[in-house]
C-alpha cells in the first residue's frame, strides 16, 4: 500500500492537535489541496489496521508483564454500532503502567459498553499479585487481581462534603478526613523529593504512613453522618473501598492516586470536544490505536509526527517478531535515533 504523504500530517492534526477531519478538509483547500474527510478517515483506519496494530498489540503484551497498572475510562459516541442507537454511550478505556521507573506504556481501548468485564478482559493475563490503580467505578470489581482505591478520589469526596467557609473548621468530620489524606500525600511527596529507593519507601511507609492509614480507618468507623448528606456520600464511598485502603502500604512502588491515568485521558477528552464522535467501530478502534502511538511518543520525549512516520516507514505486520517490534518501541535506542534524525 502506498501511503499518502499527508497521512502523517492528518493523524498529527487530529490526535495530537485535536483538529477534527472536517476542519482539516477545509484547511487543505486553502493551499489548493483536495482531500476530503472520508479519504482521510479511510487512511487512518487502513494504516492503523495494517501497520500500527502489530505494535499496539506488542505494547499490550508488554503492559501485561508489569506489576503496577492504572486504569480509567471516559464516554465516546460511536454512531454505527450493531443493534445500538447512535445516542448510546460507548467507552474509551485508558490502561497504563504505574509509576515504577520503567518505560511508560499507555494504551487506549474502545468498547461498546462500560461493563466491568471489558476491563477484566483487556487485563486478562496480568500476573497474580499485580496492582491495578482504579477509581471508584464498581465495574473494576471484576478484576481478579489486587485492586487499590485512589486516595485522590477519597479526598475529593471529603472536600465536597465540607460546607463553604468551614475549610479550616477542624471539628468538622470532613475536614478531619481531608487532613489524614493530606498527611499521606505529604509523605509521598517527601519520599519522591528525597529520591528514595522503593525498598526505602516501603520501610518509611511502615513507619510514617501506616499509623496515618490506621488512624483514618478508626476515624472512618466512627462516622455516622446524616443520611443523604454529602458527608454520607463521602463515607459510603470510602466504606465501599475499605478493603483496598491498606494495600497502598504493601509495596514502595504503589502510589496514592490515579492522577496519572486522568492526565493520560486528557488528550482524548480534549479531542472529543472537537471531533464529537466516531462514525464507525473501525474508526473508533483506529482512533484508539493512533492515540496510543501519539501519547507513547510524547511520554518518551519523541515528536509524534516523527514517531508515526518511523512506524509507517518500518511497516510492521502480523509476521513481525517481538524482537523486531522492540526496536519500534519509543524507548528503544533505534527508535530514538531514527526519530531524532527526522527532526534534524
What are these regions (language model features)?
Residues 1-344:
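Catalytic center-proximal scaffold of phosphoryl-transfer enzymes
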